[in-house]
Amino acid sequence: VAFAPPRELENPFIETTREGFHTALDISAYSLVAMAKRAQPLMQAHGGSILTLTYMASERVMPKYNVMAVAKAALECSVRYLAFEMGEHNIRVNAISAGPLNTLAARGVSGFTSFREQMGSAAPLRRNIDQSEVGDTALFLCSHLARAITGEIMFVDAGYNIMGA
């Protein structure tokens, strides 16, 4: 779950309102903590996996992502704290940081298509990803094969995140 009021993404970051900042963090970061709190009693007998989605703008500036980048950074930190605290119940918490996906919503973002093309050509695998690759990663992280993975941010972006600026 992620959201920031559109004006907070359109205006310069320094113009972020207190209300917009709060909304973005509440919906995009705190929602994971609230969900994990409610899921823990249901999961602690048999363990399990909690996943969330993030974006590399949590680590580097992506123009017009603004307060959502701050929220994603908070989300990633929450993943680590939840992984630490829930680990004793064999509950793993991880995040998938996906590259730009060609969705209807994404295509509505100004400049998305050219940005996606640039990322695909700059990625080590020289391509973009698709939804099935994110789904496959989620399936892996929820499976027994990932039983020793927790507190991690798993990049699914054809390697783009390893590239310099």
PLM features: residue spans?
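A glycine/serine/threonine-rich, flexible loop-to-helix segment
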Residues: 88, 98-123, 133, 163-165
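Catalytic loop of short-chain dehydrogenase/reductase
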Residues: 3-37, 44-88, 100-102, 160
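Short, small/polar-rich loop/turn modules that mediate ligand/substrate recognition or access, typified
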Residues: 87, 92, 149-151
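A conserved structural motif in NAD(P)-dependent oxidoreductases
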Residues: 123-134, 145
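Short C-terminal tail/terminal secondary-structure segment
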Residues: 138-139, 150-165
